[in-house]
């Protein structure tokens, strides 16, 4: 059995462990009594520990909050169902797989939609408990699964969707897959519950299981990993626990990776012990040591991360508690080798290349803008059907991007016309979409997310429409501002790496953050607190007017807000995120 390293000198070790640690210890390697709950017809949900345990299997219990009060008045439990998030490292999926997933979404999910996420995968919303094993068995048949896409594990591994640098992308994508596989849990609990559908009867069977990397109690908190290919930072690498920045050898081949750690975007309103932070540089490793580096960072976080207070359990807090130099030294000790110095790299933007792009291998790639990633047939558009019809004729693959868009990848010259015709006829290509809208993002929020405090996905289209009018008023329609709305401070919409970030505070009210940058390397500062969308638009009307009149050539809105002193930059988030007066420049490496 795995023996986790005993650590000393960490304040949290003197405090009681969180109940989640008990839950994991007693879960029989994540099986719990989920199978018993699946047989219970009296509720649409899961009871006790199982409510949490299903998250390790890639699901969350949710309900339709739009009708929650109505059902309560009728003495009914909430309309419970599950969200499922697939594991799809790098976001690549085959058209043949998509056709089967589309069929399941239409026939078995409450909302009859597929949601593309900013972690390069898809989600089903509204899957009833009775259909869960059917769903997982379908994924298994297609060579897919949902293990470790939620809870205290390494989540879906991102990889830059770069259709131009085809060979470098192929190499980086292969490492994204290898990292994902290497950091997966080893328990058979997922297969026992969802595919085989049987209990393991003997405790001796559990004694044969081991988690050599994650340990019996897995990680202290969620853990996010990305592989990024400069100069495009589409995966928002500074917002992850662990990042591998692919470095080219100058001839289009992979020379190795710069390794960064400690990014994360969640916080809690009013809790100054929580804060978003950008990831910090550890060093460079050649490709053959990438898995060793990944394992060393993960096991360091496993053993040193806070298991008492989950609000301070992410890797960024571990680095803050240990100090960056000590964290790096521990990782190097576990790697059995030192990092090499960081290799130079630079990001120039984050947005997807909407439309056709030709790769260096001669194949074409069509990036479709999907607002908030929602594929559904409604409102005069048949987006879900459109992708299905493309999947029926496409011989290449699909790539889900970290900007919630979809790439129809590897299209030969002769196949372009038919695919574009289908995309246009089903509303997947629509001329006149502003750059502002193309660079906007939202989380799901209402009606399904139980943590939502304010709307996000459902208000984004109209909010961007009003912001487009303001941009036109000030003569900036040909430009863009990275704008993101998230329904609560947990960070799913990545608003804490936006130039304009709205964070839900209460129904109809948001905190307005400004001052991030286009490249995604700076956290925006709180500008106005607990205000309505009309009030936010009024504030932005004034600020965008100033930006239009006084900006330097090529200067983004966020950079302008910092240069002119509208807000102070967040330079050292643990110190100055909540108190701008403490903003003092520090060395990041």
Swiss-Prot record:
It comes from the Bacteria. It catalyses: hydrogen sulfide + 3 NADP(+) + 3 H2O = sulfite + 3 NADPH + 4 H(+). One of its GO terms (molecular function) is sulfite reductase (NADPH) activity. [4Fe-4S] cluster binds at residues 443, 449, 488, 492. GO terms for cellular component: sulfite reductase complex (NADPH). The keyword Disulfide bond does not apply. Siroheme binds at residue 492. Keywords: 4Fe-4S, Amino-acid biosynthesis, Cysteine biosynthesis, Heme, Iron, Iron-sulfur, Metal-binding, NADP, Oxidoreductase. One of its GO terms (biological process) is sulfate assimilation. Its cofactor is siroheme; [4Fe-4S] cluster. Binds 1 siroheme per subunit. Binds 1 [4Fe-4S] cluster per subunit. Its EC number is 1.8.1.2. Pfam families: NIR_SIR, NIR_SIR_ferr. InterPro entries: CysI, NiRdtase/SiRdtase_haem-b_fer, Nit/Sulf_reduc_fer-like_dom_sf, NO2/SO3_Rdtase_4Fe4S_dom, NO2/SO3_Rdtase_4Fe4S_prot, NO2/SO3_Rdtase_4Fe4S_sf, NO2/SO3_Rdtase_FeS/sirohaem_BS. Pathway: Sulfur metabolism; hydrogen sulfide biosynthesis; hydrogen sulfide from sulfite (NADPH route): step 1/1. Coiled coil: none annotated. Component of the sulfite reductase complex that catalyzes the 6-electron reduction of sulfite to sulfide. This is one of several activities required for the biosynthesis of L-cysteine from sulfate. Alpha(8)-beta(8). The alpha component is a flavoprotein, the beta component is a hemoprotein. Belongs to the nitrite and sulfite reductase 4Fe-4S domain family. This is Sulfite reductase [NADPH] hemoprotein beta-component.
């Amino acid at each position: 059995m795995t023996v986790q390293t005993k650590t000393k000198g960490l304040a949290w070790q003197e405090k009681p462990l969180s109940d989640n640690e008990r839950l994991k210890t007693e879960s029989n390697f994540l099986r719990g009594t989920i199978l018993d709950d699946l047989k219970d017809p009296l509720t649409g949900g899961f009871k006790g520990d199982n409510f949490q345990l299903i998250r390790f299997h890639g699901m969350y219990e949710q309900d339709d909050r739009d009708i929650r009060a109505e059902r309560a008045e009728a003495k009914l439990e909430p309309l419970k169902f599950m969200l499922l998030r697939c594991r799809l490292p790098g976001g690549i999926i085959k058209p043949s797989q998509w056709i089967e997933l589309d069929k399941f979404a239409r026939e078995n999910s409450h909302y009859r939609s597929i949601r593309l996420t900013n972690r390069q995968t898809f989600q089903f919303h509204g899957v009833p408990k009775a259909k869960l094993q059917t769903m997982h068995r379908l994924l298994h048949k297609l060579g897919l699964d949902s293990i470790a896409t939620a809870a205290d594990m390494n989540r879906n591994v991102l990889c830059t969707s770069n259709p131009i640098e085809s060979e470098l992308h192929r190499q980086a994508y292969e490492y994204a897959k290898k990292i994902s596989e290497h950091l997966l849990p080893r328990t058979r609990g997922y297969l026992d519950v969802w595919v085989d559908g049987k209990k393991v009867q003997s405790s001796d069977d559990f004694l044969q299981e081991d988690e050599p990397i994650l340990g019996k109690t897995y990680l202290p908190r969620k853990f996010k990993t990305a592989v990024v290919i400069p100069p495009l930072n589409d995966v928002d690498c500074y917002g992850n626990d662990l990042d591998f920045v692919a470095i080219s050898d100058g001839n289009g081949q992979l020379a190795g990776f710069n390794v960064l750690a400690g990014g994360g975007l969640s916080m809690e309103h009013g809790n100054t012990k929580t804060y978003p932070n950008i990831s910090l540089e550890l060093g460079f490793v050649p490709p053959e040591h990438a898995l060793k580096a990944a394992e060393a960072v993960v096991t360091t976080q496993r053993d040193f991360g806070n298991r008492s207070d989950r609000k301070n359990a992410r890797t960024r807090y571990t680095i803050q508690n240990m100090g960056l130099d000590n964290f790096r030294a521990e990782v190097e000790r576990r790697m059995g080798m030192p990092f090499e110095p960081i290799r130079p790299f630079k990001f120039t933007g984050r947005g997807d290349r909407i439309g056709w792009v030709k790769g260096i291998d001669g194949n074409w790639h069509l990036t479709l803008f999907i607002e908030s990633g929602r594929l559904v047939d409604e409102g005069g558009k048949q987006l879900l059907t459109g992708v299905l019809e493309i999947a029926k004729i496409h011989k290449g693959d699909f790539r889900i991007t970290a900007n919630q868009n979809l790439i129809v990848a590897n299209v030969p010259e002769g196949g372009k016309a038919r695919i574009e015709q289908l995309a246009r006829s089903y509303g997947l290509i629509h001329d006149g979409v502003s750059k502002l809208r193309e660079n906007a993002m939202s989380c799901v929020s209402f009606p399904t997310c139980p943590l939502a405090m304010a709307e996000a996905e459902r208000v984004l289209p109209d909010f961007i429409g009003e912001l487009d009018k303001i941009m036109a008023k000030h003569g900036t329609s040909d430009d863009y501002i990275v704008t993101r709305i998230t329904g609560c401070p947990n960070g799913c919409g990545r608003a804490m790496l936006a130039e304009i970030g709205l964070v839900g505070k209460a129904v109809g009210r948001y905190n307005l953050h400004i001052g991030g940058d286009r490249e995604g390397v700076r956290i925006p500062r709180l500008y106005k607190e607990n205000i309505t969308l009309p009030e936010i638009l009024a504030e932005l009307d004034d600020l965008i007017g100033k930006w239009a009149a006084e900006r330097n050539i090529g200067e983004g809105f966020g950079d302008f807000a910092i240069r002119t002193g509208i807000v102070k930059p967040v330079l050292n988030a643990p110190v100055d995120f909540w108190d701008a007066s403490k903003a003092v420049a520090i060395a990041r490496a």
